């Protein structure tokens, strides 16, 4: 017997993909009540307007949940500590998806709904991220993914459907960019961007100045970290949200943090995306520099070898997994002494190191100097080299003599 859906909680953004969800759900699930869940991730949109749009579209209720601080502390700071970049380029702004799913589930359980819905397409990664998280947190909930079942097959058709139902969306056929925005990044996809052979148009960037329009003077920023987490900017302790907003503004005006990449989606296809993440680029650079000062060689190398694994977990939406918890435990140990101050210069799209120090620095000038010293006995190196190269020496001797097993 088919389960009757009476109440649906919808992850709602007010954009094209979710703007047409409410009328469609009400049409296809007879008498179903739709509750919109809107997460404030710092997307700098008028959320009251979005809430009213949801209600005007037929939602019985619309929740606006401010998750900016939680997003920074519980998601972005662990990401900074990990140093993870998907395919060595992507700054992983979609790390917000598990948090959105978590809030969707919390409200769904409070409202006692029997289904949740999202606006992710059947060709993208977000459907996996949302549904993995929902199944991990509340496996009893039914999941509705309209993009996989309805007759709408393109963004142009979605625009037509929206207009037919009197829904205003910030997209036109002439500039059909699909954008995602939070305090960590802005992504741009679709339209002319789908062709990697085409240069990025001037109208794409929203947070970052083109390099040709950046100041002709460098700007110095100083970042303080405590156990791998940024705590102050230019000597001033700031909340995570204020730090990110301030750094986005400073780095953005210098053209920093733009990535034009072709990535491998989880579902098997390649997609081109433009990503703006000024603050993220600066924080990653500063954190990496501080780690080079504070971590031992073997710890740093092991951590670097696990960064792609961590990036894959985030990219695939496996935030609520045992593997991710285990990696977090390792990373937290590595960050115990990643405390200190990093000075950087921002200029014409470049992040230039300008000095750093830490009370836990493992750099000893008396050991590293090229001048005469009384600490390092260079004669000790000969014995080390003999032992270090012993296996290579034996291998060469055996094969030169033709003594094969």
Swiss-Prot record:
* Binding of ATP, residues: 11-19, 119
Tell me the keywords, alphabetical order. Amino-acid biosynthesis, Arginine biosynthesis, ATP-binding, Cytoplasm, Ligase, Nucleotide-binding
A molecular function annotated in GO for this UniProt entry is: ATP binding
Q: Which InterPro entries match?
A: Arginosuc_syn_C, Arginosuc_syn_N, Arginosuc_synth, Arginosuc_synth_CS, Arginosuc_synth_type_1_subfam, AS_cat/multimer_dom_body, Rossmann-like_a/b/a_fold
Q: Which Gene3D superfamilies match?
A: Argininosuccinate synthetase, chain A, domain 2 (3.90.1260.10), HUPs (3.40.50.620), Single helix bin (1.20.5.470)
| Pathway(s) this gene product operates in, as recorded in its UniProt entry | Amino-acid biosynthesis; L-arginine biosynthesis; L-arginine from L-ornithine and carbamoyl phosphate: step 2/3
One GO BP: argininosuccinate metabolic process
Keyword Amino-acid biosynthesis, does the record have it? yes
According to its UniProt record, which reaction does this protein catalyse?
L-citrulline + L-aspartate + ATP = 2-(N(omega)-L-arginino)succinate + AMP + diphosphate + H(+)
- Where does the chain bind L-aspartate? 121, 125-126
Q: Where, subcellularly, is it found? A: Cytoplasm
Domain of life per record:
Bacteria
- Relate the assembly described in the record: Homotetramer.
Protein family according to the UniProt entry: Belongs to the argininosuccinate synthase family. Type 1 subfamily.
Protein name stated in the entry: Argininosuccinate synthase
Give the source species: Legionella pneumophila (strain Corby)
Write the lineage as a comma-separated list.
Answer: Bacteria, Pseudomonadati, Pseudomonadota, Gammaproteobacteria, Legionellales
Gene for this chain: argG
